[in-house]
Amino acid sequence: MMRTLITTHPLPLLLLPQQLLQPVQFQEVDTDFDFPEEDKKEDFEEYLEQFFSTGPTRPPTKEKVKRRVLIESGMPLNHIEYCTHEIMGKNVYYKHRCVAERYFLLMQYDELQKICYNRFVPCKNGIRKCNRSKGLVEGVYCNLTEAFEIPACKYESLYRKGYVLITCSWQNEMQKRIPHTINDLVEPPEHRSFLSEDGVFVIPP
């Protein structure tokens, strides 16, 4: 029987082993989650570290702060979807979950780093010490309003122009203090006021 098949249909049987030896072609499937591409390799490595790590996260680097915190002019800062769009675009999350709040600042990194050497003022929680900017900075405060797991995160976007409160940490490689977290963006009162020695807004009588 086999001899008859080979004689009758020689070509298909000869091509069959070649087809079996060809590499399997995988079809690309689009997903809702934006996995990092080659130019986002560092983001992907950070994602793996956050997802599988059981200890504290790495302190932020200069490049991470520039990618995750600082913004450029483009979409209007008072746009209702600003935070939802920016957070997903910058892949801001923690262990596959939405972050509860976030600040984006319209400024250069060098300007932000200089704040680390300003005087200490109370943070918004009243416990830790923060450094406050000397001038007003434009930015957006993002507050989570819907969902807890990516990519369904929805945020309320609030435009602010005020004094930035940040925490800083020492980086051995640069031998400098660098921004660690954005604690608050405090809008000054509309009426006449001044800052006390502790950096607290005081309304004169």
UniProtKB/Swiss-Prot annotation:
Pfam families: RnaseA. The gene is RNASE9. Disulfide bonds join C98-C153, C116-C168, C123-C130. InterPro entries: RNaseA (IPR001427), RNaseA-like_dom_sf (IPR036816), RNaseA_domain (IPR023412). Its main location: secreted. One of its GO terms (biological process) is defense response to Gram-positive bacterium. It is found in: Secreted. Keywords: Disulfide bond, Glycoprotein, Secreted, Signal. Does not exhibit any ribonuclease activity. Residues 1-26 form the signal peptide. This is Inactive ribonuclease-like protein 9. One of its GO terms (cellular component) is extracellular region. It comes from Pan troglodytes (Chimpanzee). GO terms for molecular function: nucleic acid binding. Glycans are attached at N131, N143. The keyword Secreted applies. It comes from the Eukaryota. Belongs to the pancreatic ribonuclease family.
